[in-house]
Amino acid sequence: MKIRASVRKICEKCRLIRRRGRIRVICSNPRHKQRQG
């Protein structure tokens, strides 16, 4: 999980999701997981 100021999709399978007021990226590739700080 990378914590970043700006999250964006890295590949086609990345999905942007809002959870508990935070923006997250979930993907089938675990390296692409991100969360907005």
Curated annotation (Swiss-Prot):
Q: Which InterPro entries match?
A: Ribosomal_bL36 (IPR000473), Ribosomal_bL36_sp (IPR035977)
Q: Which Pfam families does this chain map to?
A: Ribosomal_L36 (PF00444)
Keywords (A to Z) from UniProt? Chloroplast, Plastid, Ribonucleoprotein, Ribosomal protein
Where in or outside the cell it occurs: the entry states:
Plastid, Chloroplast
GO BP terms: namely: translation
Query: Which Gene Ontology molecular function entries are recorded, alphabetically?
Result: structural constituent of ribosome
Instruction: Give the GO cellular component terms, alphabetically.
Output: chloroplast; ribonucleoprotein complex; ribosome
HAMAP family in alphabetical order: Ribosomal_bL36 (MF_00251)
Q: Belongs to which family?
A: Belongs to the bacterial ribosomal protein bL36 family.
The protein's name in its UniProt record: Large ribosomal subunit protein bL36c
Source organism per entry reads Capsella bursa-pastoris
Gene name as annotated: rpl36
